[in-house]
Structures are given as structure tokens and as C-alpha cells.
């Protein structure tokens, strides 16, 4: 196989650069093994190579392990490897640019010499940024944002090259060699271009101040670049454009990196989006998803990672959010709803490509759960086969724990979350808390029926609850405590205070079913069938039943939680009028100061506003036409006017939730609010012409 160095520098293979197509092939073949749960094979295949591609591959392997498990030691290893990859790629990019005019130098039709190394650099920077933001150090998080900015500049430069290529290809004015040279000149990457090995490729004067960067709806040059180069998104891997594996690597990599960047930034909650807005970053979900779909077409490491990212997004985030854009058609261009057939085909492709991986089995389970097949979702995760990759095994057990929780299989739920404690150190306080909550449900079921069984579960719940608080705060995100750690510590402190005040055991001071409350936070009700939802209502009803001797002592806060969670169940049952009535009478009619104060659940207000908005969104005639549901409230009212009224009211509630002062779990609820406001904006844009 010919050396890339001989193409770049006009040298014979024997004396060429260490960078080669062989190295790129080893990156593709070896690093991809981790997606088949073969981490040892991935490490061994990349261990001896010294090229930038090998360095990147080692960084990718560590990064995947780090982001699957969130363990600090693995994150440190990933950070070190990615720094090496970034430095190596910068050096090789500099060499490629310096020798770009050597005799017989190979020129891509699309990209300037050294672009493949610029992409390696950008990929390393993006992965470093993610690791930095996940790091417990605020300093490392800030460094992560800076690396994100540098990666953006590089990726924008690559997209400008694609834009130039498509423009000239369409005009037919230049032959491929001339086109490459023209692209090189227009991007400022000729032989005379000065390059610092520590900085990324700079195309078309893109070295802007951070505050000037804008990846949003404004008609900037960057937008024009992406819009024009989007013509390439219609080209499949077998297109003549992608005859060279280097071009395949650059195109798929640039689409994946820029796509994931746009998608992730578009998803951040209001508090973080303000920070990103200040430094000039704004996301674009639709554009990002289209670029990820394009990257997933390619049969390489990048294609597989893009597929994993999208399956996680659609089966996790989309199914977590209740207010999402309406599907516009069954065409491939519609990416913001839930393109089920495309996702099923993509998952089948990945299962075939990686038959030994529990990771893709996990994604199949998530897809089943997202489509209300919780029993099948749980069954897929209860097999005997185990992943040799600890991080994948931890994910499998965690997902099994959640599914058991949604299905009200309390013993399995508790056992599985306790198993998570040994597999992952990210949020052990939460694992113990949910395990204890499951025993609260078993305790309440046994009350009045089996005293010894009730005592056993009460003791187990108490043990787990008291184990949880000391573990809270051990892990941090951007130097802040994890949201659920804060929640768990406060919640148990609240119950301990009530137990002391009421002179009752801790298990009797617990309020509204904590499992149902946790299902609400994970949006598990949207994954349930009618039978499962009816079971949830029965468990919630216990609070007001004669079996609960302490309900009369409860104040408006705990009663508000009951009405909020009950309303969420009713919404999932498509009983919107009942749900809205509970929210209005139980929460919105009260002064919000009732839910603010020491040990109080101050998330109730914003969560109730989001729930009201979700009901209104689901009452729209368009939503009912697509998803089914109850008959219209006012059949005589004009459908278009009814739709507009529902959207207007929905937006009002969302804006109130978005403006809410800081509260517990604001990042988690904020994710849903951000996605919802984007869906409303998309609806308004689509309907502005008919207003």
C-alpha cells in the first residue's frame, strides 16, 4: 500500500513520512474493536504505532471508556492521550503544509494538504473539551471551552473547503488538480502559509475572537459555509467524490465533529446556554443531526461513533423530552422528530457490524423502552452474557435498574442499583437512594399483611437511605455537586427532620412514593403502557389512603408533589383536562413561596409550569392527528386558531419556567425546557407565513 507521505511529499514509500494509509486503516480497524467490547484488542492494535492516527486512536479508546463511565482515573488517562494526539497532529499538519509544493505531491480534490491532520487535531480538541467539562475541576472545564473554540475554527475551515469544492464542481470551470490548488489558495494554506504546530488550520481568515463566533441562526459566513457544503450530505460513501480514504476520513470526521458540536450546544439548559452565548456559541439541532446522519453512512470508526451518538440522542434525549417538533414527513430530511424506521435500520446495521457488543444490545433495549416495550427492554438486559468492558457493563446494569423501576419490579430495581454501586462511582448516593426507595414501596405493600416482611423492608430502606448522604458530593461537574447528589442529601435530611418532629421511624416520615417521584424525573411514565400507568396511580393513591397514618400532617408542599406526579401520569394517559386541573389547583394557584425554603422541594414550581406546557402542546389538533388522543375540547372552534392558542399558552408557561430563579435539578428540567422552546420556535417559523 502506498504511503501517504509519498503522495504528499513526492517521496518513495521507503523514505516517506510515518503517516500512511496503513495507519489510517489501523485506526479504523483497531480502535473500532472497542465498539465490539474488545478493549484489549483495540489497545493492542494501536500500541506500537507512532503516527498521528495511532495517537488519535488511543485517545478515542480512552475517551469512549471515559464518557461511558465518568470515572476520574479514566478521564485523566483520556486527557493525557488526547493531548499527545493533538500535539502530534499539529506537528504533522505543519510538515504537510511546508512540503505541499514538493514534486509529485498528492492533492485531494476537496481538501488542502494536511487537512487530515487538522481534523485529527480538532477531534482531539473536541474530545478533550468534553473530558474537561466532565472534570471535577472548574479550571479544566474552562480549558475545555477554549479547546472547543479552537476545534470549531478548524472544522469551519474544513467546511469552507467543501463549500469551495462544491461551487467549482457545479460550475465545471476547474479540473480536480486546479480545484485543489484554488481551494488551497482560498483557504490560505499554500506553501508560504505560516503554521504554528500548536494551532489548528485557519481557513479564510477564520481566526476570530471567541465572542464573534456564532453558529446559530444569524446569516454569518460560517452559516453560508455549512449551508453550501450541505450539498455533500446527499452523497453516499460510494460516490466518486470519496474515492480516496483520506477524503472519506476527513468528510465523515468533519461532519461528525461539527454535527455533535451543534447538537450538544443546542441541548444545554438555559443557565448554561447563557454562558455559551456570551462566548459566542449557539447550537443548531437540525443541522447537527443531518451532519451526524451523513457521518453514520460511512463504514468506519467515525460512522460507528456517529451511530452510537444518534441512537443515544433519539432513544434517550428525545424520549426524555415531551415537547419536540412535529414530524414533517417520512422523508429522510426530517431528523428532529423520531425517525423510527431509519433508527431501526441503523441499529440493525450496527448489531451486524458489532455482533459481540453489549453496547448495541443496550441501544436495542433503549429503543424498545422508548417505544413502550418495557418488558422486552428489560429482558434484553437480563441475559447471562457480560461485557468485558466494565463501563459498558455498568451502563447495562444501570439501564436494567431503570427499566425495573418503571415496571414497579421493586426487588430487582433495588438489587440492580446496589450492583451499580460496585460498577460505577459516579453517583453512588443516588443508587443507594433509589434502592432504599424501592424497599419503601415493598414496605408499604406489606403493611397490614405481613408484619415481619414489612419490618424487613423498613430496615433495608433505612439502611440504604442513611448510607446515601455521606456519599453525596464525592463527584463534581464543573466544580459543582451533581444535581441528584444535592437532591438526595436534602431529601433524606428532610425526612430525618420529619421523623424527629413526628417521633416516627424514618421509613414512616417518607412522603409521596419516592419511586414514582424518581420515575417522573426520568420521564419513565412516557415509556409506560396504560396498565403500567394505572399501577402508578395506585401507588400514588397510597398517600391519601387510610394506610397512611401521617397524611394529615403533610403541608401544601408534599401535597403539591403528589398532584404534580399524578398529573404527569394522567398526561401520559392523555387525560389532559384532569392533569391541567390538578396542576392549577394543586400548585399554580398557590404562592410559589410555599415551595421555597430550608429542605423544601423548590423544583415543584418550574416542573409544574413545564407539565402545563406539555399538556397544551399535546392538545394541539396537529399533535392529536399524528399521535391520536382525546377528542377536541371545542369541536366547533377553528382548528388553526385552536392550534395557535395552544402554542401561545404553551410558550408562556415555558418562558416562565426558563426564567425561574435557580432551583434544585434546574439543569435536568432545563434540558426539557430548552428542547421545548426550540420546538415552539420551529412551529412558529413554519406557521409564520400563514399568520
Curated annotation (Swiss-Prot):
Entry annotated with the keyword Zinc: no
Region (Disordered): 170-230
Keyword Heme: no
UniProt keyword list: Cytoplasm, Nucleus, Phosphoprotein
Subcellular location: Cytoplasm; Nucleus
Cellular component GO terms held in the UniProt record: cytosol; mitochondrial outer membrane; nucleus
Highest taxon, organism lineage: Eukaryota
Known role: Inclusion body (IB) resident protein that interacts strongly with lipid droplet (LD) proteins. Involved in LD-mediated IB clearing after protein folding stress, probably by enabling access to the IBs of an LD-stored soluble sterol derivative that acts as a chaperone in inclusion clearing.
Family of this protein: Belongs to the IML2 family.
Subunit and partners: Interacts with lipid droplet proteins.
Name this protein carries in UniProt: Inclusion body clearance protein iml2
Organism annotation: Aspergillus terreus (strain NIH 2624 / FGSC A1156)
